[in-house]
Every structure is written in C-alpha cells, then in structure tokens.
Regions:
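Short, Lys/Arg-rich, polar N-terminal cytosolic tail immediately upstream
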Residues: 1-12
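A structural signal for multi-pass alpha-helical bundles of membrane permease subunits
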Residues: 14-282
Length: 282
C-alpha cells in the first residue's frame, strides 16, 4: 500500500508546487494592475508614490475625466487605424493564403518565400524609404498613410497564417468546386471563406494589437492630427508642468489598454481555436 501511494503523493506535491508558482506569477502581474486602478481613482492630492498601495481616502473620477479629455483624439485615431488596417490586412492575407495553398501557380513557392522574407525586415530598416514613399503619395502625416504602412508590413504574417491554415483544408473540396465550374473567386467565397473564422480571429487580434500598440510608425510617419493613443499617452506622461498627475497617468494607461483587452475577450475563443486548428503550424 505504501509503495502504491507514494507516487500519488509525489504527484500531488508536484501539482501543488506548480500551483504555488503560477499563483506567484499571477500575483506579480496583478500588483501593477492594482496600483493602476487604485491610483486612477484617487484625487490629485492623494495620488503620489508614497501612498501607491493604499486605497483612496476619497474616491474620485477626476483622473479619468482629464485622461479622457487628453486621449480622446488619440483613441479615435487609434480606432480608425487599428480597425481598418487589421480588416484590410486580414482580407488580403486570406486571399494570398488561398492562392498560395489551393490555387497554385508557377513560382508560388518563390512568392511565398518573399512574403516570409518580409516578416524579418525590421521597421527601422524601411522607415526612411517608407516615409519618402508616403510623401510622394501625399499620404505623409495622415491616418490613411499610417493604415497603408501597417497593412503593407502586416501582409506577410497574415499570409503565413492563412496559408498554413488553408493547407489543412482537404484539396477534394477545391477540386469538387472546380468540377462544378466555379472559378477562383467563387471557390474562395463559397468554400474557403465560410471555414476561415478561426484564422481571421488570429490575424485580426494579432494585427489589431500590433497596430494599437504601435509607437514608432506613429511618431515617424504621423502628425499631431493623426497621432494615435500611444503617442498621446506619451505626451500626457510628460505634460505635468509643476507636479506629476499620477491619477491622470494611471487612468490614461488603463484607457489605452482597454480596447485590446476587449478585442481578446470577444475573439479569444476563436483565437485559441485558430491556433489549435493549425493557423500557426507549418
């Protein structure tokens, strides 16, 4: 009995240690979130580093009000950039992935390799040529220019995700569609698109998060009237002339992070389904 019970106790101990370690990491993650939330609801005279751990003596939304006033233009710009850019890049990536996996043509492997190569080119390497291109197109400093930059840079990863996802779809479905006389677009619309929800969820979350959190493109290619929330947040952090307004800064950080959290909460189950279905598998 003792020999049989020992492995069970050992396994239980290992599981308990794993649970304690995981809870410790969760706690380390939640501590800054706690400070953010608590400080954002403090009046200005209570919001200072010495009392960061304490609850507000007087709960106030003044920090949220001032944060909203300061970030609203940036939030609107970020929504325009991230929503339109993620949808466009996902659609283009889906079409590319379909052609490269199911409607192949001579040289398809070379084209796919070039797409993969584009994933490994750092932003900094193309920033100056990209700025010159947008200037020539009269899109420099505009929201449309930022959307174009993000879409172009997001197409390679979107193409990879969709191509690897579509590889898992049986070729017999495509052949049956061809036998019925359907062309490329009809096959894509009737056969491929209805089963593409998991891959779209992966690419939309990926691209939305990337575009929402972008700072470098926005600063280098944007202008004050097209700056997204990340740039506005940076300006807010350095806008205190006399004293740092910690309540406003914490509320601003929370406001800037809420949209990406909401997107993941809404599409998270599809995101995991897309990963499990092979969206990121070779």
């Amino acid at each position: 009995m003792t020999a049989v019970g020992a492995p069970g106790r050992s396994s239980g101990t290992v599981q308990a240690v794993k649970l304690v370690v995981l809870l410790a990491f969760v706690l380390l993650f939640l501590i800054p979130v706690y400070v953010l939330i608590v400080t954002s609801f403090k009046p200005l005279d209570e919001a200072d580093p010495s009392s960061a751990w304490s609850l507000p003596g007087h709960w106030s939304t003044s920090g949220w009000s001032s944060a909203w006033d300061a970030l609203r233009p940036g939030l609107e710009n970020s929504v325009k950039i991230a929503v339109s850019g993620s949808i466009i890049s996902a659609v283009l990536g889906s079409l590319n992935g379909f052609v490269l996996s199911k409607w192949r043509f001579p040289g398809a492997d070379v084209v796919f390799t070039l797409f993969l190569f584009g994933m490994f080119i750092p932003y900094q390497a193309v920033m100056i040529p990209l700025a010159g291109l947008l200037t020539d197109m009269e899109l420099s400093g505009t929201i449309r220019g930022l959307v174009l930059a993000h879409v172009v840079y997001g197409i390679p990863i979107c193409t990879l995700i969709f191509r690897n996802y579509y590889v898992t779809i049986p070729d017999e479905l495509i052949e049956a569609s061809r036998v019925d006389g359907a062309g490329m677009l009809r096959t894509y619309w009737s056969v491929i698109l209805p089963v593409s929800a998991p891959a779209f969820a992966v690419t939309l979350i990926w691209q939305f998060t990337s575009m929402w959190n972008d700072f470098l493109f926005a600063v280098f290619l944007g202008a004050p009237d097209s700056w997204p929330v990340t740039v506005m947040l940076n300006n807010t952090a350095g806008s205190g002339a006399v004293a740092v307004q910690y309540n406003q800064q914490m509320a601003s950080a929370l406001l800037a992070s809420l949209p990406t959290l909401l997107v993941y909460l809404l599409l998270g189950r599809f995101f995991m389904r897309g990963l499990m279905a092979g969206a990121l598998k070779g």
